[in-house]
Amino acid sequence: MDVFPEELPGLPPDREVEFVIDVLPGTAPISVTPYRMAPAELRELKSQLQELLDKGFIRPSMSPWGAPVLFVKKKDGSLRLCIDYRQLNKVTIKNKYPLPRIDDLFDQLKDATVFSKIDLRSGYYQLKVKECDVPKTAFRTRYGHYEFLVMPFGLTNAPAAFMDLMNRIFQSYLDRFVVVFIDDILIYSKTESEHAQHLRIVLQILREK
């Protein structure tokens, strides 16, 4: 199935939703000194930076903004590169896009007996950052100063922006057999045959989008 490539090959297409970072009026660019890293972390940092550069997700930056980076160990022992955007988040105007209420989600599922969940791996990288806001995503490392062209993890409005995109994509099927919660899609049906049909529709949409 070509719906789920092992890795995203490069920049996503232009979409009706772009990720914007509106900051409080009068905010000056914030730059934070890079954190210390162990030798093993530095090797991993160099490798992950190169991968992000090769895919076009980041580019070298001259921005006056700059967040530090750190690693978080995942369950499988591998290291996830995280940008510490806490200072930027403090001055970002919050997006009020509503996340769904959990009790509303359960109401939709009450007659369903068959479920599938799709976790959109690296889903945030499907959304481009608005060009004028790219410099605000900048981060500093021992190996240089970079900025994101796609929406990175850790920004305060990222979940709402991705939710907005997913709801637009699946608008026709919400409250029928699809629940979207940030980067998870739940498909629910009353019967297995109905579920197979619902899955085909969702996978086709994902392939096209």
Where are these regions (language model features)?
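Retroelement reverse transcriptase polymerase core
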Residues: 1-209
